[in-house]
Amino acid sequence: MEKNREELIQGLEKLGITAGEEEVSKLISFSELLLKWNKVYNLTAIRDEGDVIRKHLLDSLTLLPYFKLYGTEVGCRTLDVGCGGGLPAIPLSIFLKDFDFNLIDTVNKKITFVRQAVIQLKLQNVNVFNERVENFHPLKPFNLISCRAFSSLASFVTLTEHLIDENGRWLAMKGKCPVEEIDQLPAGVGVEKVIELKVPFLDTERHLIAVSYTHLTLPTILLV
């Protein structure tokens, strides 16, 4: 356990994330809770704590600077679609305390776990919903709508377009750059940025695709 804790701290440093004891402890507690529930509910195929830290926690936290950037530009009310076991939103919510995180999934066992994690970690900035996103109609739109392994870009945008603010951004985590998916985006929206993500201790392709309405900015492709 101590080895995994040190790896987490080193990974956070590699990502340029300043983390105190509170943040590190909550991340470790979340990984332990995920593995405990996973024995019964099969929430993830990953069953080793070291892999959870690398492939779930650090992978999710590669998004932190981009949430900060877009949160500053367009607002901090976020929706994570197909949230599964709370990734990437739960790790992000630990650091972005001023953000309003909303997580939605159709699978009851996953939502039950996420609700327990929110209670156990005392996350005051997280709300959880168990329903289909196309049937979800909150009173206010969202500034940022994110997903991690939810669907194609076109489906992601189409299913959530009624939920996004006119100046908002869709943020989709992908493995390889999904060129064909980008080409199939519906009219009126386009890719603003394609950002190559570097996950500490992992040699794997990861990309963040930022999508917006095309009237906001000319679509650009940016690899960093």
Predicted regions and their residues:
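Conserved class I S-adenosyl-L-methionine
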Residues: 75-82
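Class I SAM-dependent transferase core
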Residues: 7-73, 119-121
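Acidic, low-complexity proline/glycine-rich segments
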Residues: 1-5
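Conserved small/polar residues in nucleotide/adenosyl-binding loops
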Residues: 214-220
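S-adenosylmethionine
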Residues: 99, 106-212
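Conserved SAM-binding loop of SAM-dependent methyltransferases across substrates and taxa
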Residues: 85-97
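Acidic active-site catalytic centers that drive phospho-/nucleotidyl reactions
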Residues: 59, 80, 105, 143
